[in-house]
């Protein structure tokens, strides 16, 4: 976010932000407004009085709506106004005429469930505030249309949402402005802080306060932030956040007196340390985390609702609704992962310390404190810092032992019925995974018998098909168990990937950045980077008709010779590029054998809130992910500072009064650019000394009188994060780790008997079985399993014995060679993946990596499908049912959209499409080398915990290969849903399209690079005919020179052959042209003779050459044999 280059420190998005109000009230005219689309984007439920829509240009705000603003806060004196830089919150909260919109989830009783769950786990409830003054009402605003013709929403800045919660914002109706948003009209009324109008006229202000909006903010936003900070008193978090932003109280502790601590872990010396570190981490998370959220952000294409690619081919409103439904189904994969993973960021409940017996010397000291998962800890009793009881715990009878319950799902949704409704909507797209222990599971019987019963305390049996109890029954086996772990696990976060990711098989290998970063002089020798190598391989494969999108196997391979030709062509292409790559590394003195040991996959997590998926659930996940990473980073700094300043005998609040400001200053330098988070500090200025404002006294009276005032920026320096850098180590380090971990990476020394059926060609041999052997009835798997067990070749009807022998020999030899060098443990399923696996395996072998398997990274991408709706009762809607037979009749013939994951998409390809990512990570801390005492941190890729997360994450068995459980440690996964081609248009550059002539030239150049071809002109002519056909008859000399490029010396021969073909009158096809030029140029074999070999040279006899004259040394002898030659010439 910090600007670099020729720009000055003051030239940034913060300084460019205009001055403006703290928020707006929008009144949307219902005519032409897309009510149905907005309903799918909202988070309403049947009893909801308010709901939210995402902040989108073309839907909720106009196209030129400023995302960053220097919001006017108060008057410092009669001529000066104080402004605070902040960005707008991602939601528009609808509060008037909400009945026009359909609920996103139709189940009833969500408010009751969330309210009871909140009380069960000891979290504070919302308390409506009483206002003595006049409250604003849309009916009393003459500038707006009739109340029945509009619906209204409030849009507020991040910094002033606490003021909106407390009813401290004042509308100024005299500044009502009509705007056009997409195809509909709206009116907006600015909201200013009550402090702007001064205390003398406070009683005359008409404030905006809606208790339903305040309840929404309390439940859907502030409760999630409180959970991330491990504080159960939500009102304290709101008050602290308001004081921090409005009164600039960033450097003083604000939460510690509201913190409660586990009763069992707060005793003794370790208990005092744990309480202090927990409080300090929460305070730093509050100060820095909320400051990051409030800061300025860059705009992005995701916000442009009018240009979403998912709507491009939609000609009817129903088609647009269907496109939104499919998009939401694809997003459901991420929500399911967060709810089903035991190590989800939603389930972090406490700060813990590793037991002494689990710590391995000094290497683990910096990671001894960590953020602990475990829903079981929610039931434990807690105490205040002085030992007074805070929460008595959850009664055993209130929950279902170690089983996941609806109360835990309500906790995961921050006890917000709006977020819970949206989560349930996503869960409806996910299939159930029946557990073999749940023999009684039957959705049809449950919906027809148990669900309609009045015993349901949420819907009383009135809507069994859409009741949350029915949904939970269907998905129950996938939720994690409720445990109290004592283990440091990675935590799963969700957000959007950054722009630059190194996700090829070898990640950031051979980027040549290390030497430049270390201060070494930049060499003049051209650098052939690993990234360029991958790009060149992709382009070479594309010229052969092989692409990442689809290989067109059946077009390229039509028989056995073409099968061998295609794969040999790939092999030769890979070998040629690999040789160039290695030679370049040698020329640049690049120590690739050592550098390969430290390569990583690098995945960026974007800290820009506007890049997140437009959904309130994803917004909550972003807030929690960012706050969690910040707290995880500062754990080590807090631990080390507490060791130097022990807290024994001092309560956390007193200790923080003495030390928090110092710790806040120290963490400022330890946060950015230390490994995990990148960012910068912005210096905020205002370009003009004055800004346009209005006379506040006149505004109270309903009049608008413009005025100009001086501007004073409250905080001139802001820290803004940019990305979280997540790394995945590729090469196994044998320095530490248990034997079980080492066994998971160890490559077996013996060759497998099934090296063919488990090798790189089996996928293609099976897919093309009928193409290669059209008359055989034997299955491909059986045939090649037998071929791999013997040295003989089979006899198959209709297949040439010569061709079959060639195919078997190639597959056997290549499979054995692949087995020897393969340390990636991947089986290719496309021609592109075959080429990349072969290339990277060869690189690893050249670097000496042959003993251990490398870590591989795969991505799970969503695939939607329509299936019969018998197992998905929500398709019926809120209807009554009386029996299973009635349910079967009503659901018969219906279909429903569900989503599954696939591993077919390449992670390197998806990584370039700005995907939504759900990724497990753990932040490890370490000190620098060579005596550097600074603490650095690294966000390392981890693993998903839980069998219900996704079926592709469970331990698999590779065909004919025995894998132990620890072998899954070398297979890492990321869930990705690309935004490009869905919400963001693919960027098409000026030179992105390729002309036909360029493709032809590239094909001709590839032919000319074959140095073993004795008849290059003949091959060039055939290649030109293949691409141009009859157009070859009119090729000029300039055309031929262009296609030949640096081989233009062959131009005359090629033109001569083309002229001959034209005179022959044959059709311009490959067969016709070949029949003519075959007689002109025949293949010939050259014989070369060495300088010492006997031959007749210029009439000299062989005898004279073998027996030279005495005293005359032989001229045909090499340098190294000069003495021997002289001795042989002497007449002894």
Swiss-Prot record:
Record GO cellular component, one term: host cell nucleus
Cited function: Plays several crucial roles in viral infection. Participates in the opening of the viral DNA origin to initiate replication by interacting with the origin-binding protein. May disrupt loops, hairpins and other secondary structures present on ssDNA to reduce and eliminate pausing of viral DNA polymerase at specific sites during elongation. Promotes viral DNA recombination by performing strand-transfer, characterized by the ability to transfer a DNA strand from a linear duplex to a complementary single-stranded DNA circle. Can also catalyze the renaturation of complementary single strands.
Family: Belongs to the herpesviridae major DNA-binding protein family.
Subunit structure: Homooligomers. Forms double-helical filaments necessary for the formation of replication compartments within the host nucleus. Interacts with the origin-binding protein. Interacts with the helicase primase complex; this interaction stimulates primer synthesis activity of the helicase-primase complex. Interacts with the DNA polymerase. Interacts with the alkaline exonuclease; this interaction increases its nuclease processivity.
Gene: DBP
Disulfide feature: none
GO MF term list: single-stranded DNA binding
Organism listed in the record: Human herpesvirus 8 type P (isolate GK18)
GO process terms (BP): bidirectional double-stranded viral DNA replication; DNA replication
The organism's place on the tree of life at top rank: Viruses
Protein name: Major DNA-binding protein
């Amino acid at each position: 976010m910090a600007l670099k280059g020729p720009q000055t420190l003051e030239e940034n998005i913060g300084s460019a932000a205009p001055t403006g109000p703290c928020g707006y009230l929008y009144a949307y005219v219902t005519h032409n407004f897309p009510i149905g689309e907005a309903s799918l984007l909202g988070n309403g439920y049947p009893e909801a009085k308010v709901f939210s829509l995402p902040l989108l240009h073309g839907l909720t705000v106009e196209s030129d709506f400023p995302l960053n603003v220097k919001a006017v806060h108060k008057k410092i004196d009669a001529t000066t106004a104080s402004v605070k830089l902040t960005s707008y919150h991602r939601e528009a909260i609808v509060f008037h005429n909400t009945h026009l919109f359909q609920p996103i989830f139709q189940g009833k009783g969500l408010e009751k469930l969330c309210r009871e769950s909140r009380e069960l786990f000891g979290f504070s409830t919302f308390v409506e505030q009483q206002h003595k003054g006049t409250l604003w009402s849309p009916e009393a605003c003459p500038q707006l249309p009739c109340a029945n013709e509009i619906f209204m929403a409030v849009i507020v800045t991040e910094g002033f949402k606490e003021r909106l919660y407390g009813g401290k914002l004042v509308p100024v109706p005299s500044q009502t402005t009509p705007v056009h948003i997409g195809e509909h009209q709206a009116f907006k009324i600015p909201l200013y802080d009550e402090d702007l109008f001064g205390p003398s006229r406070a009683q005359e202000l008409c404030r905006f306060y809606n208790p339903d909006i305040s309840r929404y903010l309390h439940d859907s936003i502030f409760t999630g932030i409180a959970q991330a900070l491990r504080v159960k008193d939500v009102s304290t978090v709101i008050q602290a956040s308001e004081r921090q932003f409005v009164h600039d109280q960033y450097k003083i502790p604000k939460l510690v007196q509201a913190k409660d601590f586990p009763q069992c872990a707060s005793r003794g010396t370790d208990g005092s340390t744990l309480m202090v570190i927990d409080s300090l981490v929460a305070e730093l998370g509050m100060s820095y985390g909320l400051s990051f959220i409030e800061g300025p952000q860059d705009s992005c294409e995701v916000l442009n609702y009018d240009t979403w690619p998912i709507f491009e081919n939609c000609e009817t409103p129903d088609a647009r609704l269907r496109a939104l439904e499919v998009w939401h189904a694809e997003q459901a994969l991420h929500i399911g992962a967060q709810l089903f993973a035991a190590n989800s960021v939603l389930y972090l409940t406490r700060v813990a310390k590793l037991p002494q017996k689990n710590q391995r010397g000094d290497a683990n000291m910096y990671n001894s404190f960590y953020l602990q998962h475990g829903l079981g800890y929610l039931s434990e009793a807690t105490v205040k810092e002085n030992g007074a009881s805070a929460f008595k715990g959850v009664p055993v009878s209130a929950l279902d032992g170690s089983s996941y319950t609806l109360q835990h799902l309500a906790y995961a949704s921050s006890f917000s019925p709006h977020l819970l409704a949206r989560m349930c909507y996503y869960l409806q797209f996910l299939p159930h995974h029946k557990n073999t222990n749940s023999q009684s599971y039957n959705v049809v019987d449950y919906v027809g018998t148990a669900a309609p019963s009045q015993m349901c305390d949420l819907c009383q049996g009135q809507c069994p098909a859409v009741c949350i109890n029915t949904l939970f029954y269907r998905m129950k086996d996938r939720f994690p168990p409720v445990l109290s772990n004592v283990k440091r696990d990675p935590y799963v976060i969700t957000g959007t990937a950054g722009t630059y990711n190194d996700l090829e098989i070898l990640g950031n290998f051979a980027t040549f950045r290390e030497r430049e970063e270390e201060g070494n002089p930049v060499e003049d020798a051209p650098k052939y980077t690993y990234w360029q190598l991958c790009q060149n391989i992709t382009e070479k494969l594309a010229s052969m008709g092989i692409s990442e999108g689809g290989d067109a196997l059946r077009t390229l391979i039509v028989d056995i010779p073409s099968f061998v030709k295609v794969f040999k062509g790939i092999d030769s292409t890979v070998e040629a590029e690999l040789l160039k790559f290695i030679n370049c590394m040698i020329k640049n003195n690049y120590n690739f054998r050592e550098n390969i040991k430290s390569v990583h996959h690098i995945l960026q997590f974007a800290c820009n809130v506007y890049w997140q998926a437009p959904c309130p659930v994803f917004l909550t996940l972003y807030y929690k992910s960012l706050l969690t990473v910040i707290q995880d980073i500062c754990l080590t700094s807090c631990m080390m500072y507490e060791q130097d300043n022990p807290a024994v005998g001092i309560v956390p609040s007193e200790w923080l009064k003495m030390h928090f400001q110092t710790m806040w200053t120290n963490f400022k330098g330890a946060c950015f650019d230390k490994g995990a988070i990148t960012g910068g500090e912005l210096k905020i200025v205002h370009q003009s000394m004055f800004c346009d404002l209005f006379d506040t006294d006149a505004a109270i009276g309903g009049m608008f009188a413009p005025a100009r005032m001086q501007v004073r920026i409250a905080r001139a320096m802001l820290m803004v994060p940019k990305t979280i850098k997540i790394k995945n180590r590729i090469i196994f380090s044998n320095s530490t780790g248990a034997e079980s971990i080492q066994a998971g990476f160890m490559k077996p020394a013996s060759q497998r008997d099934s090296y063919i059926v488990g090798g790189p060609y089996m996928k293609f041999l099976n897919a093309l079985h009928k193409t290669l052997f059209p008359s055989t009835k034997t299955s491909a798997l059986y045939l090649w399993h037998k071929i791999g067990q013997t040295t003989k070749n089979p006899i198959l009807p209709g297949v040439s014995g010569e061709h079959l022998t060639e195919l078997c020999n190639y597959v056997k030899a290549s499979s054995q060679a692949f087995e020897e060098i393969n340390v990636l443990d991947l089986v290719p399923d496309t021609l592109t993946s075959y080429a990349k696996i072969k290339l990277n395996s060869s690189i690893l072998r050249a670097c000496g990596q042959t003993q251990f398997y490398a870590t591989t990274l795969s991505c799970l991408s969503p695939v939607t499908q329509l299936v019969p709706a018998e197992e998905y009762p929500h398709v019926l809607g809120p209807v009554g049912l009386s029996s299973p037979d009635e349910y079967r009749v009503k659901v018969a013939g219906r279909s429903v959209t569900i989503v599954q994951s696939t591993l077919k998409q390449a992670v390197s390809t998806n990584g370039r499409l700005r995907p939504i990512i759900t990724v497990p990570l753990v932040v490890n801390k370490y000190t620098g080398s060579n005596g550097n005492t600074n603490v650095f941190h690294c966000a390392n890729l981890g693993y998903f915990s839980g069998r219900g997360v996704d079926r592709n994450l469970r331990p698999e068995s590779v065909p004919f290969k025995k894998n132990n459980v620890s072998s899954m440690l070398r297979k890492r996964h990321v869930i990705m849903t690309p935004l490009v081609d869905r919400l963001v248009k693919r960027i098409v550059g000026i030179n992105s399209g390729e002309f036909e002539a360029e493709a032809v030239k590239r094909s001709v150049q590839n032919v000319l690079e074959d140095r073993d071809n004795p008849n290059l002109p003949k091959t060039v002519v055939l290649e030109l005919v293949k691409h141009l056909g009859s157009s070859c008859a009119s090729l000029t000399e300039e055309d031929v020179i262009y296609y030949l490029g640096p081989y233009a010396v062959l131009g005359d021969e090629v033109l001569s052959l083309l002229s001959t073909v034209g005179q022959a009158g044959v059709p311009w096809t490959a067969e016709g042209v070949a029949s003519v030029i075959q007689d002109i140029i025949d293949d010939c074999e050259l014989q070369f003779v060495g300088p010492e070999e006997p031959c007749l040279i210029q009439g000299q006899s062989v005898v004279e050459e073998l027996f030279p004259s005495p005293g005359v040394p032989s001229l045909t002898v090499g340098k190294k044999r000069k003495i021997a030659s002289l001795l042989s010439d002497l007449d002894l």
